[in-house]
C-alpha cells in the first residue's frame, strides 16, 4: 500500500546561483558525501545537485513533514546503484519518520524517479509499505 507520495520541481538556475553565491557552504549543508562525490564527477554538476535537491524535497513531502520536525537535509541521500538507478537512503530523523508511517509488520520501499530538462529538475517519491514475509 502507498503510505507517502511527494514530488518537487527545481529551477536548475536557482541551484547554480546557490552554488556560485554560497559554494562549499551550501554543498556541505545540503548534500551527503556520496552525493557530493557523484555530482562533482559530472560535467553538469549543477543539474546533478538540482536533481538531488528535488529528490530530498520530494522525499520530505512523502514523509509528510517537509523539511521540518527535526529532519535534516543530510538525513536523506540519493545513492546510485551500479546500474545507475537512483535510490533514496534515509538515516536519523528521516528514518524515524518513515517508521511512523508504516503499519505493524510492514517494511518500506522507497521508489524514486529523478529527471532534468534544463532549466528544470524534477523528482517523484513514492513510499510503499509491504507486509513482511
Curated annotation (Swiss-Prot):
One biological process GO term for this chain?
A: fatty acid biosynthetic process
> Which cofactors are required for activity?
Mg(2+)
Q: What is its EC number?
A: 2.7.8.7
Q: What protein name is recorded for this chain?
A: Holo-[acyl-carrier-protein] synthase
Query: Mind telling me which GO cellular component terms the entry cites?
Result: cytoplasm
Location(s) in or outside the cell: Cytoplasm
User: Which amino acid positions bind Mg(2+), per UniProt?
Assistant: 8, 57
Fetch the InterPro entries from UniProt. Answer: 4-PPantetheinyl_Trfase_dom, 4-PPantetheinyl_Trfase_dom_sf, ACPS, Ppantetheine-prot_Trfase_dom
The family note in this entry says: Belongs to the P-Pant transferase superfamily. AcpS family.
An example Gene Ontology molecular-function term: magnesium ion binding
Give the UniProt keywords, A-Z: Cytoplasm, Fatty acid biosynthesis, Fatty acid metabolism, Lipid biosynthesis, Lipid metabolism, Magnesium, Metal-binding, Transferase
UniProt feature coiled coil, ranges: none
Concerning SUPFAM superfamilies, the annotation shows: 4'-phosphopantetheinyl transferase (SSF56214)
Amino acid at each position: 500500500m502507498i503510505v507517502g507520495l511527494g514530488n518537487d520541481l527545481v529551477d536548475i538556475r536557482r541551484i547554480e546561483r546557490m552554488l556560485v553565491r554560497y559554494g562549499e557552504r551550501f554543498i556541505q549543508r545540503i548534500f551527503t558525501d556520496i552525493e557530493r562525490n557523484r555530482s562533482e564527477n559530472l560535467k553538469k554538476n549543477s543539474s546533478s545537485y538540482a536533481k538531488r535537491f528535488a529528490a530530498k524535497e520530494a522525499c520530505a513531502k512523502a514523509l509528510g513533514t517537509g523539511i521540518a520536525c527535526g529532519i535534516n537535509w543530510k538525513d536523506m541521500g540519493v545513492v546510485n546503484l551500479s546500474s545507475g538507478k537512483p535510490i533514496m537512503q534515509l538515516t536519523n530523523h528521516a528514518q524515524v519518520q518513515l517508521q511512523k508511517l508504516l503499519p505493524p509488520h510492514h517494511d518500506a520501499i522507497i521508489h524514486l524517479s529523478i529527471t532534468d530538462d534544463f532549466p528544470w529538475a524534477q523528482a517523484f517519491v513514492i513510499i510503499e509499505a509491504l507486509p513482511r514475509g
